[in-house]
Regions:
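Bacterial N-terminal signal peptides that target proteins for export
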Residues: 1-9
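Sec/Tat signal peptide C-region and signal peptidase I cleavage site
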Residues: 17-21
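Extended soluble regions of mature proteins
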Residues: 22-267
């Protein structure tokens, strides 16, 4: 999911049921080796620095202004809401609880030793991640002369070179105005706090050259070679549409739950 986040950005300014022009974007993501048969479809909603990402029965909403986020499960009809810091605190609390559950069957005179060992393992992982931060990565963005059309919109191909290796190819649209609906810098700052709960690690996408490219337009197609598999994300539909504040909130009849009780794919 991290690879798709930089494609999605938005914001809310006015009252609850008032309509504003926003964007609805449909995209598909799949591994190049599997082709279309393994594709996952996602619907993205943008408006005034708010973004909603829907996939099957799940939705994730980010408010870049307030720092609030929602995880919504439409199948179980519940949701979790909070900030990135609150999520990090709850994840840590859940890990501490898991450790205590593991210690329940350990003889009492051995528990403190085992507890210290678990804590050391967790601290060691954090330290390892910190040392692996690629702050010194050489990231170069090459704008090519290659033009194309994706989802009915003109795009220009960019090449992302990381330490001399072609890592991404990005087809960027600069004239539809999608990227004017959000602050790219605000989005990256928000996501840095969000992803901290899952990985204490930067990526080449945090580098200034990459962020500056993202500010120039909206990516309608990406070939990502950074991971073990070549992943392709391609927009299939772009629509400017009136959206309301309620489009970026859980339904009124859904119940709020603790993060650890949510079936979100994050816990």
């Amino acid at each position: 999911m991290n690879r798709q986040f930089f494609l999605t950005i938005s914001l809310l300014l006015l009252a609850s049921n008032t309509l504003f022009a926003g964007w609805v974007i449909v995209q598909k993501t799949y591994d190049a080796s599997e082709g279309a048969q393994g594709e996952i479809e996602e619907i993205l909603y943008f408006q005034d620095d708010k973004v909603k990402m829907m996939s099957e029965d799940m939705a994730t909403i980010f408010d870049l202004n307030s720092g609030e986020m929602y995880f919504i499960n439409y199948q179980t009809r519940n949701y979790w809401t909070g900030t990135a810091q609150e999520m990090e605190d709850q994840v840590k609390a859940a890990m501490d609880e898991m450790i205590e559950q593991q210690l329940a069957n350990v003889p009492e005179d051995k528990r403190e030793e085992m507890r210290a060992m678990y804590k050391q393992m967790m601290a060691g992982q954090t330290e390892s991640d910190a040392h692996s931060r690629p702050s010194d990565l050489a990231v170069t963005i090459e704008k090519t002369t290659e033009k194309s059309v994706v989802a009915g919109l003109p795009v220009t191909k960019y090449r992302v070179i990381v330490d001399g290796k072609l890592t991404e190819e990005v087809w960027l649209n600069t004239d539809a105005g999608i990227h004017n609906e959000f602050s790219v810098q605000k989005f990256y700052d928000f996501m840095a706090g969000f992803l901290k709960s899952f990985q204490n690690q930067e990526t080449y996408k945090d580098q200034e050259a990459y962020v500056q490219m993202a500010k120039q337009g909206y990516p309608l197609k990406i070939i990502d070679r950074a991971g073990a598999y070549e992943t392709i994300t391609e927009v299939t539909s772009v629509e400017k549409k009136n959206l309301s504040r309620s489009d970026f909130l859980p339904p009124n009849d859904f119940s709020e739950q603790a993060l650890t009780d949510m079936q979100t794919g994050f816990n």
